[in-house]
Amino acid sequence: MTSQIRQNYSTEVEAAVNRLVNLHLRASYTYLSLGFFFDRDDVALEGVGHFFRELAEEKREGAERLLEFQNDRGGRALFQDVQKPSQDEWGKTQEAMEAALAMEKNLNQALLDLHALGSARTDPHLCDFLESHYLDKEVKLIKKMGNHLTNLRRVAGPQPAQTGAPQGSLGEYLFERLTLKHD
């Protein structure tokens, strides 16, 4: 059934919004995996877990905001399968943060591509929506993750030969306590 409210909303933009919803849901799913991995009793980095669980919530809310936009414009939400996270065991905080940063850069590129498509299709409402709700937030999150990675690399220092304890454990613990503390 065709929407009676649809105006200046191309099918290409509609499809791209649906793909972006899926990317947000996949990011949320991945952040849930990360959050609960770091909160396990054998990992016990609650601040890191909390950081990733908050991101899971933000990405889910971002997906819902896109779905509301789709309905407001007369588009149709077409749900796709959400791909499971690439792994179940995430290793050290630095490795997890690197994976999260790569995912955010991919998400940011998808937002930029959608903005460019909106500009090409002369859809100022879409461009304003993305600028108001996503683009600046995404850049700030990428910067924050980059800062966290810099600090994680700094506290990890040079990796000596294995001495029985996992490498970088003290630095990882200090990063979690001093940077991501919550409570």
Swiss-Prot record:
The keyword Metal-binding applies. Residues 7-156 form the Ferritin-like diiron domain. Oligomer of 24 subunits. There are two types of subunits: L (light) chain and H (heavy) chain. The major chain can be light or heavy, depending on the species and tissue type. The functional molecule forms a roughly spherical shell with a diameter of 12 nm and contains a central cavity into which the insoluble mineral iron core is deposited. Interacts with NCOA4. Stores iron in a soluble, non-toxic, readily available form. Important for iron homeostasis. Iron is taken up in the ferrous form and deposited as ferric hydroxides after oxidation. Also plays a role in delivery of iron to cells. Mediates iron uptake in capsule cells of the developing kidney. Degraded to release iron upon autophagy activation by nutrient starvation. Pfam families: Ferritin. PANTHER family: FERRITIN, FERRITIN LIGHT CHAIN. InterPro entries: Ferritin, Ferritin-like, Ferritin-like_diiron, Ferritin-like_SF, Ferritin_CS, Ferritin_DPS_dom. Belongs to the ferritin family. GO terms for cellular component: autolysosome; autophagosome; endocytic vesicle lumen; extracellular region; ferritin complex. This is Ferritin light chain 1.
